[in-house]
Amino acid sequence: MIKILLLIDYSSEFDRKLLRGLVQYSKENGPWLFYRLPSYYSAMYGEQGILKWAKEWKADAIIGQWHNDTIDLQKELNIPVVLQNYHHRSVTYSNLTGDYKGTGRMAAQFFAKRMFRNFAYFGIKGVVWSDERRQGYHQEVKRIGGDFFSFESDKQEDEIRMEVSQWLQELPKPVALFCCDD
């Protein structure tokens, strides 16, 4: 039986769907044995604790979030590692990712079909899926000759509420607004 160590939170819909998909794949192609470390485990024991746990359990693969590349998991464990990182794509490991630029282009096309000429984007700075959605959206808006407006921040919602409110009021109307997150 293949042992898969999961470093996945289950608080978001994406994560829950990912977990369901892994279980379904295991049923069709397994059997796989999953073990999900609680999200607090990394905070309590750090990367070395996760590495130690994976070695002791004799994991055959790791799937999940790994926020920094200070430990080379493949070198230390000699097993496949697939990551779903929030801020950036890993250059060391395989990545679970989406066609974020394509999502941005599709959003712009959706609004263009509804005859919008002003296109606004609200995003989070420094997060791969937000950055790439903006890029795709902006590229498509530029291609179709629309006007593009963007607001991006890495601050918490309560810190930027007034800035966002002012930005929204100043946008030319009518405007198509694409937000980075569902």
Features from the language model and the residues they span:
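Bacterial carbohydrate/catabolite-sensing allosteric modules
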Residues: 1-61, 71-182
